[in-house]
Regions:
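FNR-like FAD-binding dehydrogenase module
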Residues: 1-399
Length: 399
């Protein structure tokens, strides 16, 4: 674990060690029978959120109302308000352009863990909201009949038939279950583009069904939904402004070139500047105008010109990458494209004395520009780095 030398000179020894400990704690990941959990620090934060919400919902009595017919059970009320409060955070942590990244500098892909696990916490809290809504009429019917279970079941069936919130709630639970299942790594890898398409559709349907399910006059529940919609619009507008700036109200023109082993090199000139290791989203209007695909930039920006050349290496697997490869194979080497980004990127490495860059296969596309940037800075005396170990593991040597 390395701390930049320039920071080490400024920090006391104890603070330096504490900083190194925090970094080591963050990078560590627990594995349970092949299931990789989030990094330790996000895991602690998510566990704290889960425990706090669970204790707040389940730790207060009573769970059900007594003596007041058709009154909502307190357990369901607490769980419902908690679930609504989670929704704006879940949506904003899953957006590329979000206020959390702007305020903290944390790139949006590092917030995805809160987006994914926040949805799982939401599902758990939503189940705690739904179950008492069914149990309450059962208890009311049983109590009013002197303890007859059949009367309780009848009252529960009547509540289900006469209350439209049960139907909308069931739809919401089904949608939320599918959102969580389809977001698992296995399903994402099957067909990423289809995953993105259906994820957007199902999420919009989920948010739209929340409005009729929530009572607009009860505990200001719609305020959370309005906040969520506002954050979504703000994210879209931010990306639109960024896209207009990157593309100058026109499309860039990418050049395609086939390489060995199903690889395609995408090259395009642009005026935007980026940091080594960052990535961009490319939208090809003549292929799939409604979809954009992330690609890591393998080059570094020019320091002596207003324009730079972005080069991308894409392996043809399926979807857009296969279409690009086939297009280049047919001799169609030029294609218009919209640029969205750049996003992400590692921390500044110029303060480290010894740097180890590890890559596997096409993962080298992230580390190669870091290597180029460090070498250039070493030549210009702009870095503390004295030694770079570059390790690239591949299945076979290219012909």
């Amino acid at each position: 674990m390395f701390i930049p030398r320039e920071k080490k000179r400024q920090l006391p020894s104890s603070l330096f060690k504490f900083s190194a400990f925090c970094r080591g704690l963050h990078y560590h990941c627990f594995r349970i029978k092949g299931w990789q959990l989030p990094h330790t620090v996000p895991l602690i934060m998510l566990a704290t959120l889960f425990v706090w919400m669970t204790v707040w919902v389940l730790g207060t009595l009573p769970y059900y109302s007594h003596g007041f017919k058709n009154e909502k059970p307190p357990l369901a009320t607490r769980a419902g308000s908690s679930a609504l409060a989670l929704i704006p955070f879940i949506f904003t942590s899953g957006s590329r352009f979000n206020p959390i990244s702007l305020a903290t500098g944390i790139s949006h892909e590092k917030l995805q863990v809160f987006h994914q696990y926040g949805a799982r916490i939401l599902l758990f809290i939503s189940v705690l909201h739904g179950i008492p809504m069914l149990v309450q009429p059962y208890l009311d019917g049983k109590r009013s009949s002197g303890g007859d279970p059949a009367a309780g079941r009848t009252a529960m069936q009547e509540a289900w038939d006469n209350n439209p919130h049960f139907e909308s709630g069931t739809v919401l639970i089904v949608l939320l279950v599918w959102i969580n299942i389809s977001s698992m790594r296995f399903f994402r890898r099957l067909h990423y583009e289809f995953f993105v398409f259906q994820h957007v559709i199902i999420t919009v349907a989920f948010l739209a069904n929340l409005f009729p399910h929530s009572n607009v006059t009860y505990m200001d529940s719609w305020n959370y939904l309005f906040a969520t919609v506002a954050l979504i619009i703000w994210s879209w507008l931010g990306r639109l402004v960024l896209s207009i700036y990157c593309n100058k109200l026109s499309t860039a023109h990418a050049q395609l070139e086939n390489l060995n082993e199903g690889m395609t090199r995408i090259s395009l000139k642009t005026h935007i500047k980026w940091k080594p290791g960052q990535y961009i989203y490319l939208r090809f209007p003549f292929l799939k105008v409604l979809q954009s695909h992330p690609f890591t930039i393998t080059t570094i920006p020019s320091t002596d010109s207003d324009t730079s050349v972005i080069q991308i290496l894409a392996r043809a697997k399926g979807g857009i990458t296969r279409k690009l490869y086939d297009r280049a194979k047919q001799g169609k080497t030029h294609i218009p494209v919209f640029i969205d980004g750049p996003y992400g990127g590692p921390n500044n490495l110029k303060g480290y004395k010894h740097i180890l860059l590890l890559s596997g296969g096409t993962g080298v596309t992230c580390n190669f520009p870091l290597l180029l940037d460090l070498v250039r800075k070493m030549e210009n005396g702009e870095t503390e780095c004295e030694l770079i170990d570059f390790v690239w593991s591949v299945r076979s040597r290219s012909k």
